[in-house]
Every structure is written in structure tokens, then in C-alpha cells.
Amino acid sequence: MAGRVKWVTDIEKSVLINNFEKRGWIQVTENEDWNFYWMSVQTIRNVFSVETGYRLSDDQIVNHFPNHYELTRKDLMVKNIKRYRKELEKEGSPLAEKDENGKYLYLDFVPVTYMLPADYNLFVEEFRKSPSSTWIMKPCGKAQGKGIFLINKLSQIKKWSRDSKTSSFVSQSTKEAYVISVYINNPLLIGGRKFDLRLYVLVSTYRPLRCYMYKLGFCRFCTVKYTPSTSELDNMFVHLTNVAIQKHGEDYNHIHGGKWTVNNLRLYLESTRGREVTSKLFDEIHWIIVQSLKAVAPVMNNDKHCFECYGYDIIIDDKLKPWLIEVNASPSLTSSTANDRILKYNLINDTLNIAVPNGEIPDCKWNKSPPKEVLGNYEILYDEELAQGDGAERELRNRPGQPVGPRAGRSRDSGRSVLTTWK
């Protein structure tokens, strides 16, 4: 039956096509009857647009949710997380607890961020509280480090404004929306270099939320040693880890591509910081990923024809606190090294094993919850049905003195939540 699956893609990457061909699937065009379409975010917009009026049949599935941008657009991700915090606060959830300075104890995992031009005055007010801070500015809808720059003076933004006297922000080239965030200027360094984590997370359904973590993530390193010096603010080889930028650096290594496996990072941290501290760090990373998904779940169009593999970008500071930087809807499938090619081939293979019933035609009624033995390098990160089914959340949430936050422990293998007291 596997040979009957008809596939289409508008992303010509060998790691995709080789996986489809290995399964004996048949390539067709988008105008023919197809069962599986691995598409770009531009195409998914057209497929689900009101104008197109395209209706997917039960034997058709696609690799994006219709409004994935609620998570993957930088401004909307922050907006949804802020809304989620306020909702938990209204409900009196222990997760929304704050310290004496009004800072969230457990939900402070995204750098302070403002939308421009909308929040320009709020940003200026915050900037003046800490005039020595550095901020990073990013266009909302771009990837691969495009259009990003760092600032440490208000005048650097006013240069972009047609009329700085009005304190309004207007880009000279377009009126494109930007986010501006406090720059994490104390990143954890290895070999003196800044790095971030790229982690892959597969969501098979948002309601109920079920997500999987891919165990083979990696670290991306800058090619130039880090310095917070203001003289290097414009040097993106110091500050941005994106391979699309670093590969143009003089010191870029084409053999390892400036990458480390997450397992190597874990071993390094265990040897330098200790096993307990390292385990706590990774528990916190898993916890904030699930919180970000819970933040967008209510607004996500949970179309049964969809699944999505996200690329999460996490930065760890020198106090071993993880920060969610952004989420990518189409993490790069370009292979920069031999190891990269193997990793991404296996990522697609394991993703297909969850999205499509084994040896069968795609079926939107399939719950995308296969037995553990076919998960490959994925492991269940959170399963809302199992978490609610055992009744543990409500009981633990009501117990006085019950620990909350990412330190409270997890049970990923059972499919229960990373945090025992989650909402």
C-alpha cells in the first residue's frame, strides 16, 4: 500500500525527496490528486486562504498548521505569551507567581520585547530605565539573520525615522514591523564563543496538545570570540549564530559547520557544571517549549490535516538560564556538512513515521500517536490527554506547598507533562 502514497513538495531538498522515494511513494504535481504535500509557508497560506476555497480530503495531509505564524512570527509569539501570562495570573495559577520586583518567577523565559512601531513610546520608557543596555532589533517576518542589528542608543533608531520629533518609528525602506528585545549580553560561552541551540519539536495536534522533542538537536557557534564591547556591535560574526551568516566568516569550518550536538553540550556541562545542574537546565528548556505551545494552542487553527515540525532557538546565559529567542516554521533542510545531512534525513524519516500511519495512505483521522517503538529519535514531550487523564494536575495544583516551575520534575516517557503542576 505504501507505493500508493502520492507526494508533492515545493521544497527541493534531497533529505525530503530521498525519504519519499525510500518509502516507494509516487511523485505527482500539485494539480493532480495527492496525499502528502510538504510545502513552504507561502504555499500553505494559499492553500488555506479564503479566496482559494481549497478543501482537503480525508486522505490529504500537510506539514503546516494554517496560522502557524501565531507561534513563528516573532511579534505574535511574544504577544501570545504575554496574553498567556495574564490569563494564568487572572486564574491565580502558581505558575504566574511574581517576585518582589514584579518579575515572573517561572514565566520569565522570553527577553523583554516590544513591537515597533506600535510600542515605540513604551520601548523608549524602558530604554531610559537602563540606558547602558544593548537591544537587538529584528524584522518580524524574516529568517536566517536577515535585517537584524544591535543598538545601544536611541539615536540609532531615530536614524530610521522620517520624523524623529514625533517619536514615531518608520522604516526608511518599508513600513515593515519589527520587534526590539533586550539583548542577552551575558551568554554562556564555550571556547570564548557565543552559541545557541536549535531544537526540533513536532506538534501533531494542539487540542489536545501533543508534542514530541527530537533528541538530536545541535548548537550553532559564532566564528569570532564574543565581546560585549560596543565597538563590535555591528560585527554579526560575534553576535548572530545563524549558519547563513557564519558560513561567510573567515574562520568558518566546513567540516563541522560550527556545530556541536546537544549530547556533546550536555557532556561538556556535566563535566564543567555538574550533572544535577545540567539536568535542571534541560528540564527548564523542555518546560519553556511546552509553555510556549500552551500559549498559542487556544488561537491555533487545529486543522486535522496538519502537523508541524518547528525549529526552536534557545540561548543559555552564563547563569545557565535558558531564553526562548524564536521559533521557526520551516527550519532549514539544507545540509552544510555530512553529519548535518544524516541528522536532517533521520529527522524527516522520524517525522513521517509519526505523521503518516505505517505503510498506509495518509488519514487525517489518524491521531498521530504511534507506538513508542516507531518514534525513532523523537520522545513524547507533552501529551495533554494523558496529563489530564490521571487527574494529577488538579490534585497537585491544589496541594499547599507543592513545588512549581521547571524544577518540579517531569515524566516524559509516560507522556505526562514536564511539570507536575501545570495548568
From Swiss-Prot:
EC number: 6.3.2.-
Entries under InterPro entries matching the protein: TTL/TTLL_fam (IPR004344)
Primary enzyme class: ligase
GO biological process terms held by the UniProt record: axoneme assembly; cerebellar Purkinje cell differentiation; epithelial cilium movement involved in extracellular fluid movement; flagellated sperm motility; immune response in nasopharyngeal-associated lymphoid tissue; mucociliary clearance; protein modification process; regulation of blastocyst development
Binding site for Mg(2+) 1: 313, 326
Tissue: Highly expressed in brain, heart and kidney. Expressed in liver, lung, muscle, spleen, testis and trachea. In the brain, expressed in ependymal cilia, cortex, corpus callosum and striatum. Expressed in blastomere.
Highest rank taxon of the organism: Eukaryota
Annotated positions for site Essential for specifying alpha-elongation versus initiation step of the polyglutamylase activity: 144
Key words of the record: ATP-binding, Cell projection, Cilium, Cytoplasm, Cytoskeleton, Flagellum, Ligase, Magnesium, Metal-binding, Microtubule, Nucleotide-binding
One function term, GO molecular function aspect: protein-glutamic acid ligase activity, elongating
Binding site for Mg(2+) 2: 326, 328
Cofactor(s) named in the record: Mg(2+)
UniProt-annotated binding residues for a protein: 144
Record-annotated TTL domain positions: 1-367
GO cellular component: ciliary basal body; cytosol; extracellular region; microtubule; motile cilium
Reaction catalysed by this enzyme: (L-glutamyl)(n)-gamma-L-glutamyl-L-glutamyl-[protein] + L-glutamate + ATP = (L-glutamyl)(n+1)-gamma-L-glutamyl-L-glutamyl-[protein] + ADP + phosphate + H(+)
Compartment annotation: Cytoplasm, Cytoskeleton; Cytoplasm, Cytoskeleton, Cilium basal body; Cytoplasm, Cytoskeleton, Cilium axoneme; Cell projection, Cilium, Flagellum
Chief localisation class: cytoplasm
Pfam families with a match to the protein in the record: TTL
Family: Belongs to the tubulin polyglutamylase family.
Comment text on domains: Gln-144 is the main determinant for regioselectivity, which segregates between initiases and elongases in all tubulin--tyrosine ligase family. A glutamine residue at this position is found in elongases TTLL6, TTLL9, TTLL11, TTLL13, TTLL10 and favors glutamate-chain elongation, whereas an arginine residue is found in initiases TTLL2, TTLL4, TTLL5, TTLL3, TTLL8 and favors initiation.
Subunit structure comment from the entry: Part of the neuronal tubulin polyglutamylase complex which contains TPGS1, TPGS2, TTLL1, LRRC49 and NICN1. Interacts with PCM1, CSTPP1 and LRRC49.
The protein's name: Polyglutamylase complex subunit TTLL1
